[in-house]
């Protein structure tokens, strides 16, 4: 059934979208739209979202006002300058540690991690550097109860050179880090471009997945008849696996 959100103003409530998956939205869906934080949160609440991904502490008051949570916080790493290159570690680490504290303070479940550009590094070298970094911060994530999620992105169309572009690479990284608080952010749009075979891949690797992102393909558009990804069976498969995280 519908779960009422917390009152936003006197007498104003919004129901959560019904279903077995807790749906959220990414901040990026509001790109190009002139809305302040409060307006963005209200729009997200109106469509039944549980929260918004990739927002920081400046959003926390508005999220709380509309009964939302920050489903994933930025963690200081970047698509180009990520944790696969040790020259970025000193800059990223304090930002990630602060993001973990911020997340714990508001009971946000996740902080995003980005591998970074290959930039001449082999996949093995990059993974070794990621393991070194994550082994330094994983204890804090475990102590605070916040999950670090490494995003899988496509290197074919949107992010040439991005290292964590295959599920198998991400899963191997998870196994090496060996922490219940390090998982993958499985982006269905990006992995459709890189691998396809979405449902089988998710079923085989759900233990390593902490969060999902979605979009249509081609063109990262809305889920309509122009897009090749048919989401209903994907969503059913994820729900049937007992997934308890967020789907944004």
Which sequence ranges carry the predicted segments?
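Active-site-adjacent beta->alpha loops and helix N-cap segments on the catalytic face
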Residues: 57-68
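Conserved beta-strand positions in the central sheet of alpha/beta enzyme cores
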Residues: 51-53, 72-74, 112, 149, ...
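Short, hinge-like loop/turn segments at secondary-structure boundaries
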Residues: 69-73, 88-90, 129-130, 166-168, ...
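Short, conserved active-site loops that position catalytic residues or coordinate cofactors/metal ions
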Residues: 66-68, 72-78, 115
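Histidine-acidic metal/acid-base catalytic patches
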Residues: 1-47, 107-109, 164-186, 190-248
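Active-site-proximal loop/turn and secondary-structure-junction residues that shape catalytic pockets
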Residues: 29-31, 56-58, 76-79, 117-119, ...
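Active-site acidic/histidine proton-transfer and metal-coordination neighborhood
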Residues: 2-4, 15-17, 81-183, 193
